[in-house]
Amino acid sequence: MAAVLVVMASIAGSAQYSKKTLVAHRGASAYAPENTLAAYRLAIEMGADFIEQDLEVTRDGVLICLHDASLERTTNVAKVFPDRFATIVVDGKPRKTWLANDFTLAEIKRLDAGSWFNASFAGERVPTFDEAVALVKGKAGLYPELKTPEMYLLRGVNLERLMEAALDRNVLRGPKADRRTPVILQTFSQNTAVRLAQLKIGVPIVLLLDDNNPFESIDRLRQWKGIVQGFGMPKSLVTKAPQLLNWSHASGLTVTPYTFRPDAVQPGFTDVTDEMEFFLKKLGVDAVLTDSPDRFPQQ
């Protein structure tokens, strides 16, 4: 935590949102398998301002769009590679897992990433980040999350440097970047947020929070100004600790709550559209992450 006390110059010259903003959580993931090109394509069609990608890394160092560090939840890896599992202990019990970082891109491309969601999506593949960029570029912004960076460091993989190279390779930062495709990086890792700022990554950084309020005062929160440009937090934290929104805005930082889903609407709202409208217009948050981009309230 001491590293965050270092005063740094702001890495982004302007706020990351120009209006109340719709971020498609893993694409239009209520209607298509998360983190697939099908989900990203549908989110674009539904008018999303930004498309979120969760990023993991293959054994041969390629950024792929995948939420979990392992492959078994959203692919048929256990069927295609039944003997390539690692054994981990969860709640005192051994469990098989197929870590993405143990497989090459070519091997991962053999997997079906759609059938788990619906048979109509059979044959969808795990996309690379570059493939996601190619689809989204010029149509919406990119909202990648750097997943489990500490695990990758233990495996000799520098996720921040891979992200930096991807931004340059796809011309996503600097004067030649396409203004129609802004990029916002997000991470739960405080250390990663600091390292990205130290790299002068050149795009806004959002630090993600969990259900617990880490800031007992506005002064503690303001220590992040100049390192990150905003916070992402559970929508429940926005309501139970409303001072976070006030402190963030008073510090020039944005707030983006997650995740708005039709099947997980908080009590007191008629539907997910009503819920998002309350957060955006009444509470004054800057953006929302939702699985259902088509339910975003009219602005």
Residue ranges of model-derived segments:
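Phosphate-group recognition and catalysis centered on beta-loop-alpha active-site segments
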Residues: I11-Q299
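Bacterial N-terminal signal peptides
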Residues: M1-S10
